[in-house]
């Protein structure tokens, strides 16, 4: 996908770049497949901030996605490839032979007019959904289920791809985009191929306003806060943090503290932890 670079007409356009939308269709989303959504602004049901740096942004319509891919043995044609403001990948409108229409994540390389199908006897080609038991080793996949029938939960971001590396008994070994290696039931469905829009990481927003359009607010450093707000806060003028090592706003050690529950039931299925950032 082409990346458009801006000239430095203003400070906001200097180094700014956007992705080209040549493969997208500029149409309104299907009304039956959309619904309104409340912007939570990072608050929980009591109004307390649980996810910082969120709020504002443009109003959005939610596109109901088909993560289950449970239209078994019913071929569908890709009618359009559309922009979705709720995720960083594009979406496809699939028109099935029985007349039903659904939105799915856009697999890389899929074009308008291509045919896809779900089922255990589907061919190993991009966009088709099959159980892991029917896929050969080394297959690149996305939208992978963790629990059979629950719908895809792994490898759903733009450019994400997982890899099937082993099968033994009723379990398959999968390498996820984060580097984690884990066991998953071979009855789980997955879609063949990589998610599209892989060049999203090369996009340069250029100015703070572009982030605000997406509902992302500024990240304030703890060292410029008051002591009541952050462990790094306080002091006269530009002061050091006054601690042996950096801390989170809640007093935990920053940069490397494990956030996963120690006694989580699914720990036995994880063969190798994900990479640290």
From Swiss-Prot:
Annotated spans, Disordered: 30-60
Entry keyword Ribosomal protein: yes
Top-level taxon: Eukaryota
Listed Basic residues bias regions: 51-60
GO CC, alphabetical: chloroplast; mitochondrial large ribosomal subunit
Xref: SUPFAM superfamilies: Nucleic acid-binding proteins, Translation proteins SH3-like domain
A GO term, aspect molecular function: transferase activity
The keyword Ribonucleoprotein is annotated on this UniProt entry: yes
Primary residence: plastid
Family: Belongs to the universal ribosomal protein uL2 family.
PANTHER family given in the database record: LARGE RIBOSOMAL SUBUNIT PROTEIN UL2M, RIBOSOMAL PROTEIN L2
Quaternary structure note: Part of the 50S ribosomal subunit.
Name under which the protein is recorded: Large ribosomal subunit protein uL2c
Organism (species): Angiopteris evecta
């Amino acid at each position: 996908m082409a990346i458009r670079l801006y000239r430095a007409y203003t400070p906001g356009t200097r180094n700014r770049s956007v992705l080209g939308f040549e493969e997208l269709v500029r149409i309104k989303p299907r009304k039956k497949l959309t619904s309104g959504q409340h912007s939570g602004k990072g608050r929980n049901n009591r109004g307390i901030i649980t996810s910082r740096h969120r709020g504002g942004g443009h109003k959005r319509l939610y596109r109901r996605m088909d993560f289950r891919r449970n239209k078994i043995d019913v071929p569908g044609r890709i009618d359009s490839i559309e922009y979705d403001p709720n995720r960083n990948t594009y979406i496809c409108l699939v028109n099935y032979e029985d007349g039903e229409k659904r939105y799915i994540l856009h697999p890389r390389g899929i074009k308008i007019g291509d045919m896809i199908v779900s089922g255990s006897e589907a061919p190993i080609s991009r966009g088709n959904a099959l159980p892991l038991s029917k896929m050969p080793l080394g297959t690149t996949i996305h939208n992978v289920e963790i629990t059979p029938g629950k719908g895809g939960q792994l490898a759903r971001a733009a450019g994400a791809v997982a890899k099937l590396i082993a099968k033994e008994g009723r379990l398959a070994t999968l390498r996820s985009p984060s580097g984690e290696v884990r066991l998953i039931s071979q009855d789980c469905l997955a879609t063949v191929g990589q998610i599209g829009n892989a060049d999203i990481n090369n996009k340069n927003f250029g100015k703070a306003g572009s982030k605000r359009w997406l509902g992302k607010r500024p990240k304030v450093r703890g060292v410029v806060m008051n002591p009541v707000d952050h462990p790094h806060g306080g002091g006269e003028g530009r002061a050091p943090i006054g601690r042996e090592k950096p801390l989170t706003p809640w007093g935990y050690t920053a940069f490397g503290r494990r956030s996963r529950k120690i006694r989580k039931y699914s720990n036995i299925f994880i063969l190798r932890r994900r990479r640290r950032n």
